[in-house]
Regions:
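Cytoplasmic helix-loop-helix junction between adjacent transmembrane helices
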Residues: 142-178
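C-terminal transmembrane helical hairpin of 12-TM major facilitator-type secondary transporters
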Residues: 312-355
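A late C-terminal transmembrane helix in Major Facilitator Superfamily
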Residues: 358-403, 408
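Helix-loop-helix hairpin linking two adjacent transmembrane segments in secondary transporters
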Residues: 167, 172-219
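Conserved MFS/SLC helix-loop-helix module at the cytosolic interface between two early adjacent transmembrane helices
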Residues: 97-136
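Helix-breaking motifs and short loop linkers at transmembrane-helix boundaries and internal kinks
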Residues: 79, 111, 132-137, 197, ...
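Transmembrane alpha-helices of Major Facilitator/SLC transporters
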Residues: 286-309, 323
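Paired small-residue
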Residues: 137-146, 337-345
């Protein structure tokens, strides 16, 4: 099973019989055999339908990162500190993990379109919470709903894009749609907030318009899944890491944790770094820096497919080390160039590490435990995107944001170095390990 994963988003496997994923692409076994799109190759697929599915995916994921350049404005308006910014951000991960564990395979059981529509409605409700500007409770509610939406959307949309894309580009198509959406969210919000009126309203109103268009396209898409008849009971999915998978799961999960921690740093507090340390208050620039991280991750994931997981995984850790050294230097020297360079290098490292970790774990896990194992991997990854960044916020109350960022950078460098060295020493045995017989 070859995994091609987008970032906090999805990770498809390629080939016929695409499977429904969890929030960031956890592969869940299909409930009813071959998807309808494969059975109707002449009518189910096509460039317009594939483009429509990719647009739906990108628009939905853009909502999860849309608030990134705006947190500083909320902080000024509502009077809370950097710690609360990171807590508001991290609530998103709670929603994603809950959706992953409860509803990761619902699109197999109910069909792609119903789950996509539910995800878009949740995303619209999230945007509505931000539009109301009702203080911290609505910000928390908006972020939680955004996490639920991402959890539902990534599984169903990844599968839909895979099933509608041309055969040779399925994995990259889903990855590009996911990462493109995640990157365009802060870029769109930053540009609108900087150069248009009503900076806390217009980005979310624009997103609602895009969501309406995505909903209309979803209704026009062919149903690519064949839900079983009668429909099975909807029940939560479990997590399980079989004993034979644990030797590769532990380092792969640590690499995912570290890579997602870098994502969390940039999507939660990099605008604060730029304002407080680099004295750059342009929100469009802040959004562009975050955009560069996700674009770089896409490049890293593409390179991972060509390099091979046993080599790409330790190389990804090396990229995370170099990237965070550059971020630390940017904070010490007040250099935007070093911050952008660190964003790109760290993003490439995250992409290499994440996709190769997915590939390694999914290949080693037996078929009957694959969904639960990958679910566990994503729980670790989303803990990485939330817990460390809350630590940065907590440290900033006593040390200041600059010093908290330096401590974070040092911790990531230490963890990624240790995991990378471990993976490099064991790469030959990992490459030689046989895949389970399904």
């Amino acid at each position: 099973m070859r995994s091609a994963t987008p970032g906090p988003g999805s990770g498809p496997s390629e080939g016929r019989g695409a499977r429904s994923r969890g929030p960031a692409g956890a592969a869940h076994p299909a409930a009813a055999g071959e998807p309808a799109a494969d059975a109707e190759d002449g009518t189910g697929r096509g460039p317009l339908r594939y483009a429509a599915a990719a647009f739906v995916f990108a628009v939905g994921m853009a909502g999860t990162t849309l608030p990134t350049p705006l947190y500083g404005l909320y902080r000024q308006e509502l009077g809370f500190g950097e710690l609360m910014v990171t807590v508001v951000f991290a609530v998103y991960a709670v929603g994603v993990i809950a959706a992953l564990l409860v509803a990761g395979d619902y699109s197999d059981k109910l069909g792609r379109r119903p789950v996509l529509l539910a995800a878009l409605l949740l995303s619209a409700a999230s945007a509505g919470c931000f539009l109301l500007e009702g203080g911290l409770p609505l910000l928390f509610c908006g972020r939680l709903l955004s996490g639920f939406a991402a959890g539902l959307l990534s599984g169903a949309a990844t599968a839909a894009v895979l099933e509608l894309a041309p055969g040779g580009s399925r994995g990259f198509a889903a990855t590009a749609a996911n990462m493109g959406g995640l990157g365009c969210g802060p870029l769109l919000a930053g540009v609108l907030a900087q150069y248009a009126p009503r900076p806390l309203t217009l980005p979310f109103a624009t997103h609602l318009v895009l969501l309406a268009a995505a909903g209309a396209l979803t209704l026009a898409l062919p149903e690519t899944a064949r839900p079983p008849r009668p429909r099975p009971r909807l029940r939560p999915r479990g997590m399980e890491v079989p004993r034979q998978v644990r030797p590769v799961f532990v380092p792969a999960a640590l690499a995912c944790f570290t890579g997602f921690a870098v994502f969390g740093l940039f999507t939660a507090v990099s605008p604060g770094f730029m304002s407080a340390t680099l004295h750059i208050g342009n929100l469009a620039v802040s959004g562009a820096v975050v955009f560069s991280v996700f674009c770089a991750s896409l490049l890293g994931q593409s390179a991972s497919a060509r390099t091979g997981a046993p080599v790409a995984l330790p190389l990804g850790c090396l990229g995370l080390v170099v990237g965070m050294v550059q971020v630390g230097l940017s904070l010490l020297l007040g250099s935007l160039v070093l911050l952008v360079t660190g964003a790109v290098t760290g993003g490439i490292g995250q992409g290499l590490a994440f996709r190769s970790a997915m590939t390694t774990v999914s290949r080693r896990a037996p078929e009957e435990h694959r969904g639960g194992t990958i679910s566990a991997l994503f729980v670790v990854a989303y803990l990485g995107i939330s817990l460390p960044v809350v630590g940065v916020g907590a440290l900033s109350t006593g040390l200041g944001l600059r010093n908290a960022g330096l401590v974070f950078s040092a911790c990531v460098v230490a963890l990624a170095s240790g995991v990378g060295a471990w993976l490099w020493r064991t790469r030959k045995s990992a490459a030689a390990a046989p895949a389970p017989v399904d």
